[in-house]
A protein has these predicted regions:
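Short, functionally important secondary-structure microenvironments
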Residues: 2-294
Length: 294
């Protein structure tokens, strides 16, 4: 896990309270630093911007990267990690594949599974591009650890993976456990097909996937395995299997509602919906003026 004495602590000259938010000058300096990191990573001049209240959503579209204005020394490394993750999408993700996914699913008669295939694609593609950055730019690893600690790892998720919840044979259970396959608390016996899914995705050799199309191929393969299993399950029933799934599970795990809330945060990250506090128009203009003056 990530610790606060790494990452930006090497270059940030900061002695203030870790929860005290940055002022406009500090935000401008942070924007400049992240822009440099992104340029080094991608080799491109990709704008890194704060989003004003009247400028719509803050999702990265492959052309620019939006960052939150609510930054302090406590969350700075995770903000940088998120920007680097989005920069990796700009460099490695083929947005044309994402835009034409409906065509691919129509051609293969899989449109009914679009929601789950897109979720699986987001998961596999994130693992693919993060693996590239993690190995090609080891200096950024602490920022990535901070990002994952903020958006993926939590005591609720850790205990939930070992507990009795999300062991029903349905899509929600598989989604929760697939998204957390890289968590050390993963239980591959929690669901009947989870180990097969784990082997198909094969996180240890994720580097074998060299394109977004390859990620989509894996997502479709996983979907087809699970869809076939669920079709068979409707005929045979799942009560006995779910009893087997709960063997060895911890009885003192968190409630389903607690897990659901933490899981929703992970799902939003996968969709690119990372909460980013916006600035007002005047503040944005002031930050831009500070940046241009240096």
């Amino acid at each position: 896990r990530y610790t606060m004495n790494k990452g930006s602590a090497y270059w940030l000259n900061e002695t203030r309270n870790t929860d005290e938010n940055f002022d406009l000058i500090e935000l401008a300096n942070t924007q400049r630093a992240i822009t440099n990191f992104v340029k080094i990573q991608t080799g491109k001049e990709i704008p890194v911007e704060f989003i004003a209240n009247n400028e719509g959503d803050s999702m990265t579209d492959g052309k620019k990267i939006a960052i939150s204005s609510l930054i302090n020394t406590h969350n700075l490394d995770s903000v940088i990690g998120t920007a680097l993750h989005e920069a990796a999408h700009c460099k490695y993700t083929d947005f044309f594949v994402l835009k034409r996914i409906a065509n691919r699913l129509l051609e293969t008669n899989l449109m009914g599974g679009r929601r789950w295939i897109e979720m699986l694609l987001n998961f596999v593609e994130d693992r693919r591009i993060d693996n590239l950055v993690y190995h090609n730019a080891p200096g950024y690893q602490d920022y990535y650890r901070a990002m994952y600690d903020r958006y993926f790892y939590s005591t609720i998720i850790d205990r939930g993976l070992k507990g009795k919840e999300y062991r029903e044979e349905n899509w929600d259970s598989y989604a929760f456990r697939i998204i957390n396959l890289f968590n050390k608390n993963t239980d591959l016996k929690a669901l009947a097909c989870l180990e097969e899914v784990y082997n198909i995705i094969d996180l240890k050799t994720i580097g074998r996937l060299t394109s977004t199309k390859h990620s989509l191929d894996v997502a479709i393969e996983v979907y087809e395995v699970l869809n076939k299993y669920f079709s068979m399950q409707k005929r045979e029933g799942s009560k006995h299997q779910e009893q087997e799934n709960r063997k060895g599970a911890k009885s003192n795990g968190p409630s389903k509602e607690e897990i659901k809330k933490a899981f929703a945060k992970q799902e939003e990250f996968l969709k690119g919906n990372v909460p980013k506090t916006k600035v007002n128009k005047k503040e944005k203009q002031q930050i831009e003026a500070i940046t241009k003056s240096k």
